[in-house]
């Protein structure tokens, strides 16, 4: 079940960030020196609270009472920015990520968005293919100085 998150849910949300992104941080060699917050795998609570307070729409995917997935999105000028879709490693490959993405698409349409945009580690071929299989296309790249990866920019027309 997907439900909107309140400020009191943020500690559980942070757990999903830390454990969900840890596999990515390890796979791509993300450290505090080459990538802020290790690509969100060590995101501090104050940054998550700041995102919540600045209007990021946050949703949790629950298996029973446990938050096992997260969706963060922002609306601006007819475009939905997909900040994060995270599923805990032990719950992956069960359709939870797809459910979160489909939910994001519905919410974006309801709010008048014509597109969803995101940035991701382009070397993460499995994730890139997943987004492509779900209607996203590559629209460019960005290389950040000192980062051990290139960001692939993707978008999906709704």
Residues of each region from the PLM?
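C-terminal "cap" of GNAT-fold acetyltransferases
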Residues: 114-134, 140-158
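Conserved acetyl-CoA pyrophosphate-binding loop and the N-cap/start of the following alpha-helix
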Residues: 61, 91, 95-103
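A short beta-loop-alpha structural element at the N-terminal edge
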Residues: 1-16, 22-27
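Conserved beta-strand in the GNAT
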Residues: 60, 66-74, 81-86
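A conserved beta-turn-beta hairpin within the catalytic core of GNAT-like acetyltransferases
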Residues: 74-83, 92, 113-114, 146-150
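Conserved GNAT-fold acetyl-CoA-binding loop/helix
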Residues: 18-47
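Conserved acyl-CoA
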Residues: 99-115
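A short helix-loop-beta-strand connector motif used in the catalytic cores of GNAT acetyltransferases and
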Residues: 42-60, 81
């Amino acid at each position: 079940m997907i439900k909107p998150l309140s400020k009191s849910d943020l500690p559980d949300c942070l757990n999903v960030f830390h454990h969900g992104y840890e596999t990515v941080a390890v796979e791509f060699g993300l450290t505090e020196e080459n990538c802020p917050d290790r690509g969100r795998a060590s995101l501090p609570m104050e940054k998550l609270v700041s995102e919540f307070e600045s209007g990021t729409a946050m949703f949790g995917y629950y298996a029973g009472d446990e938050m096992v997935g997260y969706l963060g999105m922002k609306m601006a000028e007819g475009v939905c920015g997909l900040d994060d879709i995270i599923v805990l490693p032990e719950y992956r490959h069960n359709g939870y990520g797809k459910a979160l993405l489909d939910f994001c698409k519905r919410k974006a349409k309801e709010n008048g968005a014509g597109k969803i945009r995101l940035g991701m580690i382009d070397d993460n071929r499995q994730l890139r293919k997943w987004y492509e299989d779900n209607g996203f296309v590559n629209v460019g790249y960005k290389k950040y100085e000192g980062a051990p990866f290139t960001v692939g920019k993707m978008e999906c027309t709704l």
